Amino acid sequence: MSDKVVTRFAPSPTGYLHIGGARTALFNWLYAKHTGGTMLLRIEDTDRERSTAAATAAILDGLSWLGLGWDGDAVSQFERAPRHREVAEELVRMGKAYYSYETPAELEAMREAARAKGLPPRYNGQWRDRTPSEAPAGVKGAIRIKAPTEGETIVHDRVQGEVRFPNKDLDDFIILRSDGNPTYMHAVVVDDHDMGVTHIIRGDDHLTNAARQTVIYNAMGWDVPSMSHIPLIHGADGAKLSKRHGALGVEAYRAMGYLPEALLNYLARLGWSHGDDEIMSIKDMISWFDIGDVNKGAARFDFAKLEAINGAHMRRMADAQLLDIFIATLPYLEGGPAMAARLNEHNKAQLLAALPGLKERAKTLVELVDGAAFLFATRPLPVDEKAALLLNDGARKILRGAHEALNALSGDWTAAAAEAAVRDYALAGGHKLGAVAQPLRAALTGKSTSPGVFDVLAVLGREESLARIADQID
């Protein structure tokens, strides 16, 4: 086996790239990057009834959006079926596997007999020492591995530790069906060996498969890759992750306005940590990650924590970089396509200028769309219910004075100049600053919350600001 680390991510294209699969891909990718190795991608599309091209495209799109690139071309497991058959037949020639010729009815009777005795349903090995010459006419044979019947099969797992499986519990399982198609258990081993995979990192729901796959490795005389079975993700209530907990495709998280780097940061910390470090860059994660540091216990998914991490990433990101990501994500966000359709160089510059204030109040890009909506609004500005309460008759009277003070401003129209003018007006009129700033905010944005009102004035510019205020006092 190569000294260079080779990991692989091997999803089944029967649906979207769900959040658990994304974390598995991330751990494989991080470990490969951390060790200077490579991560391969294999599409396990042997289930022809459920595998779809649309699901494959969704998985590739999800990985690309997250920035989890793979090395080389994606491999189709289905297209490697001839190689899987070749290895199964080689095992028969080596005496490590054999043909069995039971009919479905015979297999069901075997299972019923085991259940009647209170035993788990297992194949009884009746064709283990017989030859194909004894095969009944018209029955196609399946190939079964000759599993060891004594001792233990040991899986040396870097997360779960040493896991022992009594060989008496491993029956002679099928590796090639009677129709000539390989089983998943067999195809995975052949593919991992041929692709040079040195480290298998996957969910711990595959742990029981590891023993049977080890039997195939040993039968072929192949090195068994290092195995790491990571804990599954549960909901915040400790129950198995479901859609109500967040078991969604990564495209749903893009539509909810999460940054790829923030989502990766959050997923990395589901089962792994680095001291007290909570907010991590991709560079940090690559530098610090080691699969041996992953916990055994199930991790709990918490949307509130994800939002907090996403907000932290937005605030620490350079404004120009955040703007680029925001614009690229607009087609996927609620209200985003309409905003994207109105983008031009002028309001892009306004948006960039407003970002320092906007990102302080937003935890997601969806909230950023909502916060930035005032920049794209057309006059007369729609005013929401809370903002309307700030525009009563007394407030409109104060607005008239504020409009006059701002209109009298000479020189550059800046946040500092606007603030000085409004403060002077408030002081001269005996008003508290908030009594002036709140109706100003409502008039300028149509909302009761926004970035600092003086920043809003600066971003909108003199002409638009004065016009919006005038709309509320005329």
From Swiss-Prot:
It is found in: Cytoplasm. One of its GO terms (molecular function) is glutamate-tRNA ligase activity. It catalyses: tRNA(Glu) + L-glutamate + ATP = L-glutamyl-tRNA(Glu) + AMP + diphosphate. It comes from Mesorhizobium japonicum (strain LMG 29417 / CECT 9101 / MAFF 303099) (Mesorhizobium loti (strain MAFF 303099)). InterPro entries: aa-tRNA-synth_I_cd-bd (IPR045462), aa-tRNA-synth_I_codon-bd_sub2 (IPR020751), aa-tRNA-synth_I_CS (IPR001412), aa_tRNA-synth_I_cd-bd_sf (IPR008925), Glu-tRNA-ligase_bac/mito (IPR004527), Glu/Gln-tRNA-synth (IPR000924), Glu/Gln-tRNA-synth_Ib_cat-dom (IPR020058), GluQ/Sye (IPR049940). Catalyzes the attachment of glutamate to tRNA(Glu) in a two-step reaction: glutamate is first activated by ATP to form Glu-AMP and then transferred to the acceptor end of tRNA(Glu). GO terms for cellular component: cytosol. ATP binds at K243. Keywords: Aminoacyl-tRNA synthetase, ATP-binding, Cytoplasm, Ligase, Nucleotide-binding, Protein biosynthesis. Its main location: cytoplasm. PANTHER family: GLUTAMATE--TRNA LIGASE (PTHR43311), GLUTAMATE--TRNA LIGASE, MITOCHONDRIAL-RELATED (PTHR43311:SF2). Belongs to the class-I aminoacyl-tRNA synthetase family. Glutamate--tRNA ligase type 1 subfamily. GO terms for biological process: glutamyl-tRNA aminoacylation. Its EC number is 6.1.1.17. This is Glutamate--tRNA ligase 1. A motif ('KMSKS' region) lies at residues 240-244. A motif ('HIGH' region) lies at residues 11-21. Monomer.
